[in-house]
Amino acid sequence: VSIKGLAHVAIQAKDYQATLAFYTEVLEFKVAHHWSLPAFKINEACMLLSPDQRTCIELFDDEAVIAAQGKKAKREEDVAHGALLHLAFYVDNARETYQKALAHGAKACIEPDQLSLGEPPLIVRNALVHSPNGEIIEFIEEVDWTRSAEG
């Protein structure tokens, strides 16, 4: 048995339509499938597919009863993180995507920057935002992570 890759990440939306709009308008995901499932109190859910068709996000409405780490926060100031820290998406231009996200209601987290990681140095260009739904999203330009593994 071998892992083929990450199938999807699931997000519970405080405002389903606004969260859907953010992922489709800013990150250009498409709705691949939409459903409801009353047995799990799911009024609205969908699977979003990235432009390269390799990344999926499962989006649930706020009332859905879904397996999750920790307890659901009643207020934004109650949010405490578990193991998952942020979502990172490859983009062509981190600065442009960051600005587009801010224009669509995201809040600044870490402004666009260039980092040098490790030895030999790998240059990473990235930026992070708090999405309108609250998750932290990193926009990162392509990095050849295999370069260090090879040698």
Where are the predicted features?
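N-terminal beta-strand motif that seeds the catalytic metal site of vicinal oxygen chelate
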Residues: 1-18, 40-42, 84-91, 140-151
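Vicinal oxygen chelate
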Residues: 1-2, 89, 98-151
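Residues that flank catalytic or metal-binding motifs in active/ligand-binding sites
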Residues: 5, 44, 53-55, 83-85, ...
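Core segments of cupin and vicinal oxygen chelate
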Residues: 12-57, 103, 120
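Short, well-ordered beta-strand micro-motif
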Residues: 47-49, 61, 90, 128-130
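Active-site/binding-pocket entry motifs
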Residues: 54, 65-66, 145
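Conserved beta-strand in the GNAT
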Residues: 57-58, 138
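Helix-adjacent hinge/juxtasegments
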Residues: 58-62, 68-87
